[in-house]
Structures are given as C-alpha cells and as structure tokens.
C-alpha cells in the first residue's frame, strides 16, 4: 500500500513523502494530489434505485454524487475508487460526465459479506448494459489492495446488525490499510423494516471500538451518521434514505473530510 498519510485534523490534508498534497480549501492547488476515496457499505452506499430496475434514475449515485458535488465546490481534487462502477444520472437522463462512479457499496451485504466478498445483487438493466450474467467482488483485503485508497468511508451493518462481524471488518481494514478509515454509525430505520429497533444497540458499541483502535495507534475516526438523520429522512421501506437523507449523509462525510477552519475567539489577537 502506498504511503500517502493524509491527516484530517485541520483544513489541510498533508501527505508524508510528498512535497504537497492538498492546499487549504479555496487556495491554489498547482501541486495538489488527487485524494482516492473508497466508499464501503451496502445499498445505501451504492445508491438505491428508487425506480426499481428502470435506469436512468436521478438518485442512482445516492450520497456519493452529492458528496462529490461538495468536494468539487470546495476545490478538493478527488477520485472515488472501488470494485463497482454504477453511474449517477441527471434528471434529464444523461450520464453526468463529472461523476466519479466507482465505489464498494454491496447491496444486501452484511458485514460478513463485505469482509468475504461474493456475488452482488445487481439491477437487470446494469447487467444488460455490462453484458454480464453476474457481478462478483473480492473480499475487503483484496479490494483494498486493488483499489489503493487514501481514505475509506465505511458505513455498514444495516443488513443483519452483526456488531461482532463489524468489529472483525474494522480490524481487518486496519490491519491491511495504512490510510485513514472513517467509520460511521448506521442511519435510522423504522417500520416496516424488520429489526429496525436493533439499530440503536448496534450503533452503541461503535464509539468504544473506534476509541480502542485509536489508542492502538490506528488512523480511524467516527462519524455519527445516526444523529445526522431522523426517521423522516428515511423512505417508506424503512431503511433507505430519501433525497433529504442523502444530502445529510453527504454533509456529514464532507465535514469529516474537510473540517472547518478554526474560528478565532471573540477578543482574541489575530
């Protein structure tokens, strides 16, 4: 894995072993290095096809499209990476040429599934467009090695709520990845989603897991995505975010990637 040790403690993203990775937001970027971001998760990461199997769909890129819009507006050079490449579509049905389509959002997969890989449930229109019978992805270790991300955005567990498998997934990523891991609690769920009441206890153990890895020197941080959304931000299926929810997810990831500059205290010497 490449040594591009990005640090997200201020408005700067710095890489050891490179002269300059990314100038502060809004500054010239003549020597900026493109940040390789790998979104890892389930159908919420992939982007739900709310129109069933009919493509194109305006929400095809989910929160990934929205996050990319924010990063681009902030002047952050980036590339999304992952084993899948479902595109985002504009309202007029034309592929958005600025969209970076790759991701590792494995629809229907549990934490264990993401860890091990397998056949990904894929809309028929996507299979037809690709001319394949199925889409298969490797386990997370091989996926990391193949895609070489600088940052992993992990939000998983909505399928199965298996905290022990999540812990193994996080441990595996930390053991095979020297970049920055940003892990999120899962978003709220509601009826008629089966098991929606398990979301809170599943999320409750995540801060402790992150803290333990931080104390061990791992480069891992937490985003509280559950607190960022409300049940009103979830569609009638009880699990997938609606347009407002997707915006909030993108905002939360953006704040994690591009922290605000510290504001001077009133009366402080400038």
Task: Give the predicted meaning of each segment.
Residues 156, 185-186, 224:
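A cross-domain feature marking catalytic cores of carbohydrate-active enzymes
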Residues 161-172, 192-202, 235-241:
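Active-site cleft segment of glycoside hydrolase catalytic domains centered on the general acid/base Glu
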């Amino acid at each position: 894995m490449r040594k591009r040790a990005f640090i997200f403690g201020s408005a700067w993203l710095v890489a050891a072993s490179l002269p300059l990775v990314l100038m502060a937001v809004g500054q010239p970027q003549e020597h900026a290095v493109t940040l390789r971001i790998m979104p890892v998760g389930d159908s919420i990461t992939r982007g739900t096809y709310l129109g069933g199997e009919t493509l194109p769909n305006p929400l095809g890129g989910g929160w990934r499209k929205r996050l990319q819009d924010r990063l681009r507006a902030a002047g952050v050079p980036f590339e999304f990476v992952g084993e899948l490449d479902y595109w985002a579509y504009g309202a007029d049905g034309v592929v958005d040429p600025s969209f970076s389509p790759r991701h590792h959002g494995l629809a229907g997969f549990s934490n264990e599934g993401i860890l091990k890989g397998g056949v990904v449930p894929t809309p028929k229109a996507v299979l037809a467009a690709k001319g394949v019978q199925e889409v298969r992805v490797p386990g997370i270790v091989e996926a990391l090695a193949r895609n070489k991300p600088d940052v992993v955005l992990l939000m998983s567990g909505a399928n199965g709520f298996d905290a022990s498998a999540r812990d193994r997934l996080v441990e595996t990523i930390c053991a095979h990845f020297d970049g920055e891991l940003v892990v999120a609690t899962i978003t709220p769920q509601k009826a008629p989603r089966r098991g929606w009441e398990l979301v809170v206890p599943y999320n409750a153990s995540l801060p402790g897991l992150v803290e333990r890895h931080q104390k061990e020197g791992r480069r891992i941080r937490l985003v509280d995505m559950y607190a960022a959304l409300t049940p009103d931000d979830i569609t009638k299926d009880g699990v997938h975010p609606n347009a407002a929810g997707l915006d909030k997810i993108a905002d939360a990831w953006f704040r994690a990637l591009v922290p605000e500059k510290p504001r001077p205290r009133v009366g402080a010497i400038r």
